[in-house]
From Swiss-Prot:
Protein name per the record: Large ribosomal subunit protein uL29
GO CC terms, sorted: ribonucleoprotein complex; ribosome
Disulfide pattern: none
One GO term (biological process): translation
Ribonucleoprotein in keyword set: yes
Organism for this UniProt entry: Pyrococcus horikoshii (strain ATCC 700860 / DSM 12428 / JCM 9974 / NBRC 100139 / OT-3)
Segments crossing the lipid bilayer: none
Amino acid sequence: MKPSEIREMSIEEIDAKIRELRLQLAKERGMLTMGTSLENPMVIRNLRRDIARLLTIKKEKLREMGKK
């Protein structure tokens, strides 16, 4: 997910996307702990980075709203 795409989203949409990605991350980690090999081991890393990106841009937006 690109930062420009995230910046176009509203805060509510960002929150929904964060919940969705965290759920997907929990499922992937669960599969890993059960011994199932992942199709693409980079999935977990990419999910974590997407969540961090979403949280960062959400904080930026909230800061902007506070200044206005």
